[in-house]
Amino acid sequence: MRFLLCLILLLHSTVLAGGLQWEKTEVAIEAFEGGGKVPGELKFTNTSDQPIRIRAVPASCGCIVAKPEKRDYAPGESGVIPFTYAPKRKWGTRAYRVYVVTSEAGAPYEFRFVVTETRR
């Protein structure tokens, strides 16, 4: 009984903690030969009761550059992180990772980018 009570309290506090809620965590990109850079954005909302700071947005490949328009988001505030994919002229499908490091405790948010480059 005591274990169940502790588990309920733990889950309840986790839900209340909130954080950044993302519109999606997987991004599909299609790039075509001669088409140039492909823009996009990661959309989110701060569902916590605390301000959250975006500290860094590293990617597993230099072909993806993501730069937040601002760093600090108040509780309830929504935002976007624009990104650009620069085609590498490597035809086919590959996967990359983008991470969003915030002021929250724990691991950074992770996004999977599935890129398909097609030769015309």
Stretch-by-stretch model annotation:
Residues 3-13:
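Sec-dependent N-terminal signal peptides
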Residues 16-47, 114-120:
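Beta-sheet-dominated interaction scaffolds and their linkers
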Residues 23-29, 39, 64-69, 81-84:
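Short structured motifs
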Residues 34-41, 88-97:
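Short, solvent-exposed loop/turn segments enriched in Ser/Thr/Gly
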Residues 40-46, 81-83, 96-101:
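Buried hydrophobic-core signal for structured, non-transmembrane domains
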Residues 47-50, 89, 104:
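Short, acidic/polar linear motifs in exposed loop/turn regions
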Residues 49-77:
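Surface-exposed binding patches on compact interaction domains or structured appendages
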Residues 91-119:
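Terminal connector regions
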